[in-house]
Amino acid sequence: MALPDIQAKTRFMVEFPINASPKILFPYLATASGLSQWFCDDVRYVEGQRLNFIWDQENHYAEISGQRLNRAVRFVFLDDHRQTVADANFLEFTLDSSQVTDEVYLRVVDYSSAHDADEQQEMWEGLVAKLREQVGG
């Protein structure tokens, strides 16, 4: 009996300082219109808390599994049949503020099939640079 193809997953985490308030940043992290400006080719609401992230004309469905206004959002990716799966890939954006310096930090947690850490770092640096252009920070 053949075992299912199980891919190793990694939890990649990185933080970036951003010169914008959480109130300005959050819609870019948690809404289809905001995400489509910097994160992927397009994002569309499908139903309720489900979204379709489109990269290179390929659909990737996800569900908002948690959200705290102006603070954090988590997207859990669904299978090809738009169903939840155990050990699903997820993406989490969290905004933190330093009480001492008054700086705002974007923490990204990308849990997905194993990738080269340097490649992921470079990818997220490019994406966050696009986000900074959008918010002026």
What are these regions (language model features)?
Residues 1-44:
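Hydrophobic ligand-binding cavity/cleft-lining segments
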Residues 5, 9, 20, 50-51, ...:
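Charge-dense, helix-prone N-terminal extensions
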Residues 13, 58-62, 85-92:
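Short, surface-exposed coil-to-beta transition loops
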Residues 22-23, 65-71, 95-105:
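A short, structured loop/turn motif at beta-sheet edges
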Residues 25, 31, 47, 64-66, ...:
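A structural signal for the main folded, soluble domain(s) of proteins
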Residues 25-26, 35, 64, 75, ...:
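Hydrophobic pocket/interface hotspot
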Residues 36-81:
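Glycine-rich portal/gate segments that line the openings of hydrophobic small-molecule binding cavities
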Residues 80-133, 137:
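Beta-strand/loop substructures that line and gate deep hydrophobic ligand-binding cavities in soluble
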